[in-house]
């Protein structure tokens, strides 16, 4: 990770280390498979082992520098791009993850918070991820997070972010998100108090979850890592949330996080068990919050109509994710997640700043994309906590965008697919919950934040999220599209002032698109879009007060249903056109087509008319081309027949006899016969010069 900025680290650099690590830990089968898959050879006995590198990372002093969020995301993005550049990288990382799990299990002391469950979770996740995640990148990231993890015990909130970084591209994004959270506590005394109070719980839940999750996420940059990261982030976020609603909020996020971990890998028994145990205490503490009615019922109750639709969206997303991964576990975990999210949301509604935290934490729980996006917003949220409205707006757009980003990854990237399979449900749920929280916060806080803050943050978040989301070339393409969409969203935001609301719209469109691309069903995406639109419609009235009508309010303000229908149609068309394409781009393209294409089409239609057309009756029979047609030429009778017999005076001429012989001779033999006639005893008689001459009258 640290070396990434100086020198581009290639995943193949770690193959020998991973192979040696696997063999050292009696993982011969995995080692053999890894060697076949990567063609790696045993490293030198004198070379440093993964354990040595890991211990060095723990001792490294470079970790604290990564807290910087301004430039950190870019570096992380570059790292993520490097890690996700090769599918082999992903496989290597997964295998490394498998190795590291054992390794980390062996070296729990180093891990600081690494419970045996973490190693087990890592192993299970790595196996379930099928060595498809980037082991090398993850290991590097893990190492860094481990270092951070050591500090995290001191600072529970900070530890989860760093661990998230260590996890994978996802962990990177999550770490980015979390650093902002750390900043938030510093910025806001309330959050600091929450951290101080919550730290014990966060330290327990966050370190355990963070470590277990970090292990699982690092074990596979795929869904497991994303879900784990999100859980870690949730744990971290929950402490922050706990500030206003310390126990309940933190517990609810933890619940969501634990459910995501289950989703991330159904095979992760140890991790899921630990999470469940954590969930139980968390649930007990949240009590009324956790007892929030099922997502379907409470959303309508909540002032923001967007929440129920979002929850519905979450449900739909879980269904889709369940298709990829264990359906039951995803749905159940999603359901569990939803109540906590609702609790958090309700709390958020009551307290906009907590809501922001909750939204951020939920976004963290979402994939690294969402977490990164959240990080950028979370920074502003922390920094501009005084202007909680701004953070709310920024968080809202980032949260929505992250949600969209995870969905796109699901549609486009291989890792994304795996992530979605394992943690797509958790990501989607978290993203949806984040969106709900953010939307609620926006509605409740009625962000007065200037569109500029929202725009700048969303822009940064969107690119970060997109880069994070890409662990493969496919994902990268989707990321670029996401970035573009986010940029477009940002652009639109300045136009319509309501930065928060505008970003949410593109995010929802992206979400819908990603879901439809996932092949869950265009209906699901449309429903989600509708829900989002509805939610947007409800919060917009509130948001307009602070921000004025946003792009969403402009398009959907008149009627959420109309906008929903339009968006659904557009999304469906967009899904058909290109899964990775951003809805905004498509919308723009559609608008351009409506304005330009018709003319172009008309021109095209008209152009054929400019060429002369043959009359149907004039069709000429197909015949070989003749430059000179016999029927069109008049030949002088004197020249019409050029044979010797046709000449005047031919009869009785000296050449008549020769003609009798030569007229039947063709080709090479003709010259031979002619020569014989000239040299032989042939006597034709007197020669008349005038016999064959023809005089043409000059005309």
UniProtKB/Swiss-Prot annotation:
Residues recorded with modification Omega-N-methylarginine? 683
GO-annotated molecular function: ATP binding; GTP binding; molecular function inhibitor activity; protein heterodimerization activity; protein-macromolecule adaptor activity; RNA binding
Provide the function of this protein: Nucleolar protein that acts as a regulator of RNA polymerase I by connecting RNA polymerase I with enzymes responsible for ribosomal processing and modification. Required for neural crest specification: following monoubiquitination by the BCR(KBTBD8) complex, associates with TCOF1 and acts as a platform to connect RNA polymerase I with enzymes responsible for ribosomal processing and modification, leading to remodel the translational program of differentiating cells in favor of neural crest specification.
Bias class Pro residues marks the residues at 291-301
Biased region (Basic and acidic residues) positions are 627-637
Concerning its family, UniProt says: Belongs to the NOLC1 family.
Where does this protein have compositionally biased stretches of type Polar residues?
Answer: 381-397, 547-556
Gene name in the database record: NOLC1
Q: Where are the Acidic serine cluster repeats?
A: 84-95, 125-136, 167-178, 221-232, 264-275, 325-336, 363-375, 425-436, 470-481, 519-529, 555-566
Q: Where is the composition biased (Low complexity)?
A: 100-110, 144-159, 193-227, 236-261, 398-409, 441-476, 498-523
The post-translation modification note in this UniProt entry reads: Undergoes rapid and massive phosphorylation/dephosphorylation cycles on CK2 and PKC sites. NOLC1 is one of the mostly phosphorylated proteins in the cell.
Q: Which GO terms describe its cellular component?
A: Cajal body; cytoplasm; fibrillar center; nucleolus; nucleoplasm
Residue ranges of region Disordered?
65-637
Q: Which GO terms describe its biological process?
A: mitotic cell cycle; neural crest cell development; neural crest formation; nucleolus organization; regulation of translation; rRNA processing
Q: What is this protein called?
A: Nucleolar and coiled-body phosphoprotein 1
Its localization reads: Nucleus, Nucleolus; Cytoplasm
Q: Where is the composition biased (Acidic residues)?
A: 86-97, 321-333, 366-375
Give residue numbers for the modification (Phosphoserine): 87, 90-91, 362-363, 366, 397, 456, 508, 538, 563, 580, 582, 622, 643, 686, 698
Q: What is the lineage of its organism?
A: Eukaryota, Metazoa, Chordata, Craniata, Vertebrata
| Chain positions with Phosphothreonine modification | 188, 607, 610
The primary site where this protein sits is nucleus
């Amino acid at each position: 990770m640290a070396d990434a900025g100086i020198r581009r680290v290639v995943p193949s650099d770690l193959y020998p280390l991973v192979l040696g690590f696997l063999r050292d830990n009696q993982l011969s089968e995995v080692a053999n498979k890894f060697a076949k898959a990567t063609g790696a050879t045993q490293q030198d006995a004198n070379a440093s082992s993964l354990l040595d590198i890991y211990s060095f990372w723990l001792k490294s002093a470079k970790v604290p520098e990564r807290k910087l969020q301004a430039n950190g995301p870019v570096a992380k993005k570059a790292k993520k791009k490097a890690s996700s550049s090769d599918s082999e990288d992903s496989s290597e990382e997964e295998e490394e993850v498998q190795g590291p799990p054992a390794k980390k299990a062996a070296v729990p002391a180093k891990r600081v918070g690494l419970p045996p469950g973490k190693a087990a979770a890592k192993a299970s996740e790595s196996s379930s991820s099928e060595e498809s995640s980037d082991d090398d990148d993850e290991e590097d990231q893990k190492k860094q997070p481990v270092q951070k993890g050591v500090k995290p015990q001191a600072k529970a909130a900070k530890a989860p972010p760093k661990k998230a970084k260590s996890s994978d591209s996802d962990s990177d994004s999550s770490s980015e998100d979390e650093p902002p959270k750390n900043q938030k506590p510093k910025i806001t005394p309330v959050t600091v108090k929450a951290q101080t109070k919550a730290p014990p719980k966060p330290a327990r839940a966050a370190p355990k979850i963070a470590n277990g999750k970090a292990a699982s996420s690092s074990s596979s940059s795929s869904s497991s890592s994303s879900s784990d990261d999100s859980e870690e982030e949730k744990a971290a976020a929950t402490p922050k949330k706990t500030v206003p609603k310390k126990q309940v909020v933190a517990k609810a996020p933890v619940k969501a996080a634990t459910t995501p971990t289950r989703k991330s890998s159904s095979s992760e028994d140890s991790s899921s068990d630990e999470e469940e145990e954590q969930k139980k205490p968390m649930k007990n503490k949240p009590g009324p919050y956790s007892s929030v009615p099922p997502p379907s019922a409470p959303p309508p109750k909540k002032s923001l109509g967007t929440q129920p639709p979002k929850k519905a969206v979450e449900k739909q997303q879980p269904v889709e994710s369940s298709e990829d991964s264990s359906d039951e576990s995803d749905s159940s975990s999603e359901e569990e997640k939803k109540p906590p999210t609702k609790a958090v949301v309700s709390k958020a509604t009551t307290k906009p700043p907590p809501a922001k935290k909750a939204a951020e934490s939920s976004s963290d729980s979402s994939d690294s994309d969402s977490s990164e996006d959240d990080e950028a917003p979370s920074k502003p949220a922390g920094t501009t906590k005084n202007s909680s409205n701004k953070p709310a707006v920024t968080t809202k757009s980032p949260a929505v965008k992250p949600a969209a980003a995870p969905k796109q990854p699901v549609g486009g990237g291989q890792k994304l697919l795996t992530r979605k399979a394992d943690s797509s449900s958790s990501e989607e749920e978290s993203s949806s919950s984040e969106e709900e929280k953010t939307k609620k916060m926006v509605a409740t806080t009625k962000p007065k934040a200037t569109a500029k803050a929202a725009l700048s943050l969303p822009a940064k978040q969107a690119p970060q999220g997109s880069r994070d989301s890409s662990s493969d070339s496919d994902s990268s393409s989707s990321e670029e599209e996401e970035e573009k969409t986010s940029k477009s969203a940002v652009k639109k935001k300045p136009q319509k002032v309501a930065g928060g609301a505008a970003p949410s719209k593109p995010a929802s469109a992206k979400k819908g698109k990603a879901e439809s691309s996932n092949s869950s069903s265009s209906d699901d995406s449309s429903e989600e879009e509708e829900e989002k639109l509805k939610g947007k419609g409800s919060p917009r009235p509130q948001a307009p007060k602070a921000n004025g009508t946003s792009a969403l309010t402009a398009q959907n303000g008149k009627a959420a249903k109309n906008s929903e229908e339009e968006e659904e149609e557009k999304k469906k068309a967009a899904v058909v056109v290109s899964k990775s394409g951003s809805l905004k781009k498509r919308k723009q393209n559609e608008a351009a087509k409506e304005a330009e294409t018709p003319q172009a089409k008309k021109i095209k239609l008209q152009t054929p008319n400019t060429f002369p057309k043959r009359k149907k009756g004039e069709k000429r029979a197909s015949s070989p081309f003749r430059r000179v047609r016999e029927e069109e030429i008049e030949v002088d009778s004197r020249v019409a027949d050029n044979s010797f017999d046709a000449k005047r005076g031919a009869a009785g001429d000296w050449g008549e006899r020769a003609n009798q012989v030569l007229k039947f001779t063709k080709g090479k033999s003709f010259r031979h016969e002619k020569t014989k006639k000239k040299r032989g005893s042939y006597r034709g008689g007197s020669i008349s010069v005038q016999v064959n001459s023809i005089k043409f009258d000059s005309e």
